[in-house]
């Protein structure tokens, strides 16, 4: 190295356009001794201080009035630990030199990150509080392989990109820098000069905390500690366990009445946990809580995948929120969106001037329905970013399951595209092979590294093997939403009862494919928005019939094979559509004897009944666990089926979807005995007409429906009853 760097290099360094700052700045061993260079704009005087003894060794010479300093130590040949004593305006300040520290990434991390198989990329990329060579500070690392220069900017350096340019690791395109003295809570971003020479200010893709919109900076935040799973939580996710999910949007479940402001994570932990437990749900599912810029996206257009949104508090608050559910014996599911991201300038879009995280061709990389960008699943680093994020939420916050949004839009290249608007895969097909490989890898990794944690697919097509293991050609999900069942049964329920006999098969068709996947029956947020009306408002008839229809439908659903999901507000029959900008209509429950309270009591009892009786859940995915008893009585719109568990216990569900009571209705049954009526949706307790079977009934040795025994029943109008065979 020459005594004085080339003037052009100094100009580039000062102007923030030099891509290799470590080759100039810091201490370097030369043939003429040690050379120390520093770029300290606005500094009046700089001294080199030996850390070991605090002695001032030499004063650096100001070679350029814009802040470039240099010193030459001809008598010393070996590098040593040092600091700078800098005088800015008046008093001197002792500072560490970021450019005296060596490379941060280990070779194994560099290899795994480039390969896309690093299990925990969030432990290496992003911003991490640490101590290096006895000095406290923060290590920064960001992937931007096509950038000309990347700097860390923040409150600590006046957002000046000249002050802290980063080191490029050319083997993987990662820029890194350790900044001494930086503390938790400080704001930062990455200032990038992209491949076109344009300056971009980007939030950290791996930030653990971020500012709330409309601000866009990242915050220095410690990596959350590992949360271990438990045998009870793992068992609660099992295919043979009762799974009843309460789907919640945290920003509108309940709000402060005085200013309509959100409840915090801590406030929700006190109120929501108690309510979910009271209602008997086994799981709570949260609409996405990743940081997102637009409230109206409900979280489904996230930019800060690793940061819980600041709308409701800090990462520590969210972690305490999850822990409170676990203490109550309730598992937590997180809606996760690896399918697309918004094009906001501070986010992932054209991160280093190229289509880095997204596909370059808009026929692959632009989602025209949502005006968002689609991740490039063919890039190792992008797959690693996403797969690592899935594991992050489970390992660091104790999330028990992920529900993956819009899987169909990921696995089909022609999703919502006309002919000529999409690019076929390598073999000329419509499947996105890279996305399929990503989903298989992620699901398999979670299964191996986080046993008992599960994934759930919102997949709206008939793509085969969604819940089959990747090793035999499946996608590897544990559960799949049954969108077909939901649409068919809601269409049936919307029919006037007099016309239902013409649509009888809508309620039975789901059993023809019920065992092709591990299905969840969802009545989700998507069914109570965009003019679809509330579930209650879709029911036909006058007010009494609407509520009776809804109660009968819920009871039919809870008895049907498949796990259950219900969106908030539906449990007490909210009459209007969901509005994310205001609280649910809790005032509807003010009348304890009102219809809304009746529906709420029914859902609570359905959950407790569901959890109490194993026939309702244990063999959800075994054909032996279900038997039609009455499947073809379309004239009376009656359905009857039997649920069975592994020990032979049996429960019969019978639904009458007309307002006409059916007296002396005979149903054939496999085994005779006494059958106790354990639930009746027409009970007066639920504001029904209180017609039923006086608590139970004995079977008759009368052949019916191909069985030697039968029950002679009273079927209430627009109602479902459960009958449990007692040994």
From Swiss-Prot:
Pfam family, one: Alpha-amylase
A biological process term (GO) from this entry: glycogen biosynthetic process
Source domain of life: Bacteria
Coiled-coil features, chain-numbered ranges: none
Entry-linked SUPFAM superfamilies: (Trans)glycosidases, E set domains, Glycosyl hydrolase domain
One example GO MF annotation: cation binding
Enzyme Commission number, as recorded: 2.4.1.18
Catalysed reactions, as listed in the record: Transfers a segment of a (1->4)-alpha-D-glucan chain to a primary hydroxy group in a similar glucan chain
NCBIfam families cross-referenced by the UniProt entry: branching_enzym, PRK05402.1, PRK12313.1
Purpose: Catalyzes the formation of the alpha-1,6-glucosidic linkages in glycogen by scission of a 1,4-alpha-linked oligosaccharide from growing alpha-1,4-glucan chains and the subsequent attachment of the oligosaccharide to the alpha-1,6 position.
Protein name: 1,4-alpha-glucan branching enzyme GlgB
Organism: Yersinia pseudotuberculosis serotype I (strain IP32953)
Gene: glgB
């Amino acid at each position: 190295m020459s005594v004085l760097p080339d003037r052009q290099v100094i100009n580039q360094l000062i102007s923030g356009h030099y891509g290799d700052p470590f080759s100039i700045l810091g201490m370097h061993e030369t043939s003429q001794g040690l050379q120390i260079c520093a770029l300290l704009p606005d500094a009046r005087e700089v001294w080199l201080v030996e850390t070991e003894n605090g002695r001032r060794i030499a004063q650096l010479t100001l070679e350029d009035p814009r802040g470039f300093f240099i010193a030459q130590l001809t008598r010393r040949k070996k590098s040593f630990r040092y600091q700078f004593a800098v005088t800015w305006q008046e008093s001197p300040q002792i500072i560490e030199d970021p450019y005296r520290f060596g490379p941060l990434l280990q070779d194994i991390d560099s290899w795994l990150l480039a390969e896309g198989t690093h299990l925990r990329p969030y432990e290496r990329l992003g911003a991490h509080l640490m101590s290096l060579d006895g000095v406290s500070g923060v290590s920064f690392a960001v992937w931007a392989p096509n950038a000309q220069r990347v700097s860390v900017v923040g409150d600590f350096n006046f957002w000046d990109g000249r002050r802290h340019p980063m080191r490029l690791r050319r083997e993987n395109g990662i820029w890194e820098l350790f900044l001494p003295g930086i503390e938790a809570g400080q704001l930062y971003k990455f200032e990038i000069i992209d491949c076109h020479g344009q300056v971009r200010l980007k939030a950290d893709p791996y930030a653990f905390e971020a500012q709330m919109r409309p601000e866009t900076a990242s915050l220095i935040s410690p990596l959350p500690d590992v949360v271990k799973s438990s045998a009870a939580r793992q068992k609660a996710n099992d295919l043979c366990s009762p799974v009843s999910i309460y789907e919640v949007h945290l920003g509108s479940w309940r709000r402060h009445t005085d200013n309509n402001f959100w409840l915090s994570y801590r406030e929700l932990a006190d109120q929501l946990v108690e309510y979910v437990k009271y209602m008997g749900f086994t799981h709570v599912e949260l609409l996405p809580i990743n940081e997102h810029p637009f409230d109206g996206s409900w979280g489904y257009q996230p930019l800060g995948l690793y940061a819980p949104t600041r709308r409701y508090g800090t990462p520590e608050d969210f972690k305490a929120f999850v822990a409170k559910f676990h203490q109550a014996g309730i598992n937590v599911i997180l809606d996760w969106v690896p399918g697309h991201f918004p094009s906001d300038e501070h986010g992932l879009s054209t991160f280093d001037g190229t289509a880095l995280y997204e596909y370059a061709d808009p026929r692959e990389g632009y989602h025209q329905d949502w005006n968002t960008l689609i991740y490039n699943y063919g890039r190792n680093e992008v797959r690693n970013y996403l797969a690592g994020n899935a594991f992050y939420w489970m390992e660091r916050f104790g999330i028990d399951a992920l529900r993956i949004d819009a899987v169909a839009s990921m696995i089909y290249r022609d999703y919502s595209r006309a002919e000529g608007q999409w690019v076929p895969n390598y073999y000329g097909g419509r499947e996105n092979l890279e996305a399929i490989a990503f989903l298989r890898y992620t699901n398999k990794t979670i299964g191996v590294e986080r046993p008992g944690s599960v994934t759930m697919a919102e997949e709206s097509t008939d793509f085969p093997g969604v819940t089959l293991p990747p090793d035999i050609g499946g996608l590897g999900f544990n559960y799949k939403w049954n969108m077909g069942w939901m649409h068919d049964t809601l269409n049936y329920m919307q029919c006037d009862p007099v016309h239902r006999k013409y649509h009888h098969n809508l309620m039975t068709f789901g059993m023809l494919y019920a065992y092709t996947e591990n299905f969840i029956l969802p009545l989700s947020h998507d069914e109570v928005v965009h003019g679809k009306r509330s579930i209650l408002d879709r029911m036909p008839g006058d007010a009494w019939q609407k509520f009776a229809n809804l109660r009968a439908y819920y009871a039919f659903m809870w008895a049907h094979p498949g796990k259950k999901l219900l969106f908030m507000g539906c449990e007490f029959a909210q009459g209007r559509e969901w509005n994310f900008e205001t609280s649910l209509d809790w005032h509807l429950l003010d009348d304890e004897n009102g219809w809304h309270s009746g529906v709420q009591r029914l859902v609570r009892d359905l959950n407790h009944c569901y959890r109490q009786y194993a026939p309702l859940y244990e063999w959800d995915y075994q054909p032996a666990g279900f038997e039609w008893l009455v499947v073809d009585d379309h004239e009376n719109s009656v359905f009857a089926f039997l649920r069975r568990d592994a020990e032979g216990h049996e429960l019969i569900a019978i639904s009458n979807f007309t307002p006409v009571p059916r007296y002396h209705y005979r149903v054939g049954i496999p085994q005779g005995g006494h059958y106790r009526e354990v639930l009746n949706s027409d009970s007066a307790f639920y504001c029904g007409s209180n017609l039923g079977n006086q608590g139970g009934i004995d079977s008759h040795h009368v052949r019916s429906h191909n069985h030697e025994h039968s029950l002679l029943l009273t079927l209430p109008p627009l109602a479902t009853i459960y009958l449990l065979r007692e040994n």
